[in-house]
Amino acid sequence: MSRVSQARSLGKYFLLVDNMLVVLGFFVVFPLISIRFVDQMGWAALMVGIALGLRQLVQQGLGIFGGAIADRFGAKPMIVTGMLMRAGGFAAMAVAHEPWVLWLSCILSGLGGTLFDPPRAALVVKLVRPHQRGRFFSLLMMQDSAGAVIGALLGSWLLQYDFRLVCSAGAALFIACAAFNAWYLPAWKLSTVKTPVREGLGRVLRDKRFVTYVLTLTGYYMLAVQVMLMLPIMVNDIAGSPAAVKWMYAIEATISLTLLYPIARWSEKRYRLEHRLMAGLLVMTLAMLPIGMTSSLQQLFTLICLFYIGSIIAEPARETLGASLADARARGSYMGFSRLGLAFGGALGYAGGGWLFDAGKAVGQPELPWLMLGAIGFITFLALWWQFSPKRSASGMLEPRT
């Protein structure tokens, strides 16, 4: 085995260990924020939605800058610093008794993610060959699902005693992850050339095909982020206990671990990436529409199953398509900008979803936020259909980079 092949192989194992630590640290805390502050402390869902939206907007909206800086200085210092900042955000969240404290803790957590997320994504593109990326992204998603369940179980158990224990566990995991990266991550450069920050930013912004694709995904993310806000609230409302939320993540893990990789392998040989993305989005949209009209936990979990199936169809295709459109001369910048759709969609999905949830309850129409999300899903589907139409593809606008 050549040194390059050996480095790629070891690098992939490193990425899997690193990803598991990050997922565990995240899911110990974030799925329980809405339970803690809406159900236990009686805050309006809008207040918590703003906090979650701020984290999403800061982390993903500023990701292009984090990626551009990583292109210039390398991945390691950005990743280690960002993970320590995320740990600090969790520590601040532990003492949040006013909305503004929660907002500040989420902003700090988001700033940490701004630093570590784009270079981590760029390392995947650097270390995994193009023909292997779809399968590797599927493995990461399976790991995400398993980590989400383990993290949510640990967080739910700790929440019985004290929310400060939940935040302490999340902070400890991110400190451990920072130490792991500081000790084992080589001083790899992300791009094929040492790109100045301004040049990397400009290269992305001039790439119309990539910008169009990223911004179109805003609507997709508005649906996807509800697994952190409205779906846990719905499960808690119908079940009458926050402990039921862990079963939502258990469903996700079961579906991902049993179906994600086989579906990805089967579909990558038969369908284009954009068609898989659109099919998954359509399934997610159809699952969202009737959620507000459900009255039993069995009905809700059935729709959540359908939503997760749509997600495992769409996510590997979305990640692979975004990576294939990136320019190797500015990988960090491209991966940072690719998070902008998540920034806008997350902020709108959290804050708008929280506001619609409160409004629907106030006027006696709990189905209102879900119908609106369904409409957004259909609009996004049509936008992707237009963007990837044969005529536009033939023009070369959306042909993947080699």
From Swiss-Prot:
<dbReference type="GO" id="GO:0022857">
    <property type="term" value="F:transmembrane transporter activity"/>
</dbReference>
<feature type="transmembrane region" description="Helical">
    <location>
        <begin position="300"/>
        <end position="320"/>
    </location>
</feature>
<dbReference type="InterPro" id="IPR020846">
    <property type="entry name" value="MFS_dom"/>
</dbReference>
<feature type="transmembrane region" description="Helical">
    <location>
        <begin position="139"/>
        <end position="159"/>
    </location>
</feature>
<keyword id="KW-1133">Transmembrane helix</keyword>
<keyword id="KW-0472">Membrane</keyword>
<feature type="transmembrane region" description="Helical">
    <location>
        <begin position="368"/>
        <end position="388"/>
    </location>
</feature>
<dbReference type="GO" id="GO:0005886">
    <property type="term" value="C:plasma membrane"/>
</dbReference>
<keyword id="KW-0997">Cell inner membrane</keyword>
<feature type="transmembrane region" description="Helical">
    <location>
        <begin position="99"/>
        <end position="116"/>
    </location>
</feature>
<keyword id="KW-0813">Transport</keyword>
<comment type="similarity">
    <text>Belongs to the major facilitator superfamily. DHA1 family. MdtH (TC 2.A.1.2.21) subfamily.</text>
</comment>
<dbReference type="InterPro" id="IPR011701">
    <property type="entry name" value="MFS"/>
</dbReference>
<dbReference type="InterPro" id="IPR022855">
    <property type="entry name" value="Multidrug-R_MdtH"/>
</dbReference>
<protein>
    <recommendedName>
        <fullName>Multidrug resistance protein MdtH</fullName>
    </recommendedName>
</protein>
<feature type="transmembrane region" description="Helical">
    <location>
        <begin position="243"/>
        <end position="263"/>
    </location>
</feature>
<feature type="transmembrane region" description="Helical">
    <location>
        <begin position="165"/>
        <end position="185"/>
    </location>
</feature>
<dbReference type="Pfam" id="PF07690">
    <property type="entry name" value="MFS_1"/>
</dbReference>
<keyword id="KW-0812">Transmembrane</keyword>
<dbReference type="InterPro" id="IPR050171">
    <property type="entry name" value="MFS_Transporters"/>
</dbReference>
<feature type="transmembrane region" description="Helical">
    <location>
        <begin position="13"/>
        <end position="33"/>
    </location>
</feature>
<feature type="transmembrane region" description="Helical">
    <location>
        <begin position="277"/>
        <end position="297"/>
    </location>
</feature>
<feature type="transmembrane region" description="Helical">
    <location>
        <begin position="214"/>
        <end position="234"/>
    </location>
</feature>
<feature type="transmembrane region" description="Helical">
    <location>
        <begin position="34"/>
        <end position="54"/>
    </location>
</feature>
<feature type="transmembrane region" description="Helical">
    <location>
        <begin position="340"/>
        <end position="360"/>
    </location>
</feature>
<dbReference type="InterPro" id="IPR036259">
    <property type="entry name" value="MFS_trans_sf"/>
</dbReference>
<keyword id="KW-1003">Cell membrane</keyword>
